[in-house]
Amino acid sequence: IYRPVHLLVVPKAHFALDYHGAPGLRITPVLSADLKTAEIHAEAWVTGTAQSVQFTLGEETLSAPVTDGKAECTFKLENVHLWDGVNDPYLYKMQATLDSGDAVEANFGCRTIAFDAEKGFILNGRPYRLCGAARHQDRQGLGNALTEKEHDEDMALLREMGANTVRLAHYQHAQYFYDLCDKYGLVAWAEIPYITEHIPEGRANTLSQMTELVVQNYNHPSIVCWGLSNEITGSGKTEDLVENHKLLNDLCHKLDATRPTTMAHIFMLDANDPLVFLPDIRSYNLYYGWYVGEWDQNDAWFDEFHKNHPDAVIGL
């Protein structure tokens, strides 16, 4: 056990506890073109007999009937306060309650994201240059059994160095750290532990872990992409490996239509390989100036890639 343990006591009618480990409340903000207003779509899953769910956002409460274990409603939000990265990471809070007394709540942010081959990452309609680091949830003497103290220290280090983004490598991290990313405005890349070597017998495991990653973390405004794998061709490439990535890619799009997919390729993989272009965004782990070569070789590599694939979004 390397995460906090909670004992949950709920009435017979309660928000679903077995929906892939998610809180039972999903929130999807849809902003207007001018970013001034938004429709906030809320969905809740219920176990047991419940007639309705009361959703509360600010001073407004909407009641929605429960049909086949699910209730949903839409709020109209005026004068939207954007979640704007490290500049202004504003969070809204929504609560859902049942007549039985059970309640859940979730933070969310209103923001738009896009990726452009020329302008890079676009946050709320403007280019937003991403500079940061990959973070492992690990400490000497603790392994990955980190407490809030260590999570806070890692976030403080990222902020001290001026980072505005973090890749959460290479597995699902603690909810507390995703919350910190939301709070402090760090743009996050979240991914599953599918690394270096493809194991055909592990397909069900990868699909299960991706489902849990997306469903559990859907509400976090800091997360802008889902990572399919890391340097997965390090031990070779097979048709089954490619097929598994197609399944993962399709699964992400099915579970979440609001975020793109990505994967980090090992630097030995040919930049014209079809696998490079399977996810929505491609990325490379280049080691020039670290393991091999000189730092300025990174510039030459990306210039060549962009010349050959001018419409492809690429990250380092």
What is each model feature region?
Residues 1-180, 184-188, 209-212, 222-228, ...:
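Secreted/periplasmic carbohydrate-active enzymes, especially glycoside hydrolases
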Residues 135, 171-173, 193-195, 229-231, ...:
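Active-site beta-loop-alpha junctions enriched in small/polar residues
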Residues 142-146, 172, 197-204, 236-240, ...:
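Alpha-helix capping and helix-loop boundary segments enriched in small/acidic/polar residues
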Residues 177-178, 268-278:
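Distinct, well-ordered alpha-helical segments
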Residues 199-203, 229-256:
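Active-site cleft segment of glycoside hydrolase catalytic domains centered on the general acid/base Glu
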Residues 220, 255-256, 273-276:
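Acidic-histidine catalytic/liganding microenvironments
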Residues 274-275, 287-316:
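Glycoside hydrolase catalytic-domain groove-lining segments
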Residues 279-287:
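Structural signature of the urease/amidohydrolase superfamily beta/alpha-barrel
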